[in-house]
Amino acid sequence: MNLVMFGPPGSGKGTQSSRICSYVSASVVDCGKLLRVAALTMRQSEDLKAGKLLPDELVIGVVREKLRELIKVGDNFILDGFPRSVVQCHALFEMSSELEFEISCLVKFEVSEREIFARLLDRLVCSACGALHDVVLGRCVSCGSVECERRSDDLKVEIIKKRLMLYGAVERDIVNLFRSRSIKVLSIDAGRSVDEVAADLRTQLLMFI
């Protein structure tokens, strides 16, 4: 099963991806993390920190190589943070033909803007493994490290607004493109607790297996 996790920043895509991979036997492809460790220019790094979208060709290239690696060894994948533009969406469909894989489902996370602001202004990123978690935890739930800090693109309200605006500008077009390919779009109420969302998602996804 190959999944695409789609939703605004702070909607819980990464958190749910890490849970899903255990029962659908798939590797999580965190596009944001891939780009943060890629050999970016100084300008590109600053744009990423400012919440701006990087050039489509750069993002597509990074994702294509990662998917190529996974497909080569027979792994399924969960895409988190890609596609984020119509161009990237078309590129993903081209990759599916080129690398011979099928996209099982687009999981669309729906959550209010108010909740998104609350989450993004109250989360940390682990300096050791890159996992995201709530600030109240104080310790990384993935590796146990206490070396955590706020992600640079979560620091300012203006940056969060920009990220939400970028998502809103392409949300409908991307969803419609998946539907035009007869790919199921699964809408999830992501405004609930992590466990509630996980349970609902598990129930619905297991219907595919």
From Swiss-Prot:
<feature type="binding site">
    <location>
        <position position="129"/>
    </location>
    <ligand>
        <name>Zn(2+)</name>
    </ligand>
</feature>
<feature type="binding site">
    <location>
        <begin position="10"/>
        <end position="15"/>
    </location>
    <ligand>
        <name>ATP</name>
    </ligand>
</feature>
<dbReference type="Pfam" id="PF00406">
    <property type="entry name" value="ADK"/>
</dbReference>
<keyword id="KW-0545">Nucleotide biosynthesis</keyword>
<feature type="binding site">
    <location>
        <position position="192"/>
    </location>
    <ligand>
        <name>ATP</name>
    </ligand>
</feature>
<keyword id="KW-0963">Cytoplasm</keyword>
<dbReference type="GO" id="GO:0005524">
    <property type="term" value="F:ATP binding"/>
</dbReference>
<feature type="binding site">
    <location>
        <position position="88"/>
    </location>
    <ligand>
        <name>AMP</name>
    </ligand>
</feature>
<dbReference type="GO" id="GO:0005737">
    <property type="term" value="C:cytoplasm"/>
</dbReference>
<comment type="subunit">
    <text>Monomer.</text>
</comment>
<feature type="binding site">
    <location>
        <position position="123"/>
    </location>
    <ligand>
        <name>ATP</name>
    </ligand>
</feature>
<comment type="similarity">
    <text>Belongs to the adenylate kinase family.</text>
</comment>
<feature type="binding site">
    <location>
        <position position="163"/>
    </location>
    <ligand>
        <name>AMP</name>
    </ligand>
</feature>
<dbReference type="GO" id="GO:0044209">
    <property type="term" value="P:AMP salvage"/>
</dbReference>
<comment type="pathway">
    <text>Purine metabolism; AMP biosynthesis via salvage pathway; AMP from ADP: step 1/1.</text>
</comment>
<keyword id="KW-0067">ATP-binding</keyword>
<feature type="binding site">
    <location>
        <position position="126"/>
    </location>
    <ligand>
        <name>Zn(2+)</name>
    </ligand>
</feature>
<feature type="region of interest" description="NMP">
    <location>
        <begin position="30"/>
        <end position="54"/>
    </location>
</feature>
<feature type="binding site">
    <location>
        <position position="140"/>
    </location>
    <ligand>
        <name>Zn(2+)</name>
    </ligand>
</feature>
<keyword id="KW-0547">Nucleotide-binding</keyword>
<dbReference type="InterPro" id="IPR000850">
    <property type="entry name" value="Adenylat/UMP-CMP_kin"/>
</dbReference>
<feature type="region of interest" description="LID">
    <location>
        <begin position="122"/>
        <end position="154"/>
    </location>
</feature>
<keyword id="KW-0418">Kinase</keyword>
<comment type="function">
    <text>Catalyzes the reversible transfer of the terminal phosphate group between ATP and AMP. Plays an important role in cellular energy homeostasis and in adenine nucleotide metabolism.</text>
</comment>
<dbReference type="GO" id="GO:0004017">
    <property type="term" value="F:adenylate kinase activity"/>
</dbReference>
<keyword id="KW-0479">Metal-binding</keyword>
<dbReference type="InterPro" id="IPR033690">
    <property type="entry name" value="Adenylat_kinase_CS"/>
</dbReference>
<protein>
    <recommendedName>
        <fullName>Adenylate kinase</fullName>
        <ecNumber>2.7.4.3</ecNumber>
    </recommendedName>
</protein>
<feature type="binding site">
    <location>
        <position position="143"/>
    </location>
    <ligand>
        <name>Zn(2+)</name>
    </ligand>
</feature>
<keyword id="KW-0808">Transferase</keyword>
<dbReference type="GO" id="GO:0046872">
    <property type="term" value="F:metal ion binding"/>
</dbReference>
<feature type="binding site">
    <location>
        <position position="36"/>
    </location>
    <ligand>
        <name>AMP</name>
    </ligand>
</feature>
<feature type="binding site">
    <location>
        <begin position="81"/>
        <end position="84"/>
    </location>
    <ligand>
        <name>AMP</name>
    </ligand>
</feature>
<feature type="binding site">
    <location>
        <position position="151"/>
    </location>
    <ligand>
        <name>AMP</name>
    </ligand>
</feature>
<keyword id="KW-0862">Zinc</keyword>
<feature type="binding site">
    <location>
        <begin position="52"/>
        <end position="54"/>
    </location>
    <ligand>
        <name>AMP</name>
    </ligand>
</feature>
<dbReference type="InterPro" id="IPR027417">
    <property type="entry name" value="P-loop_NTPase"/>
</dbReference>
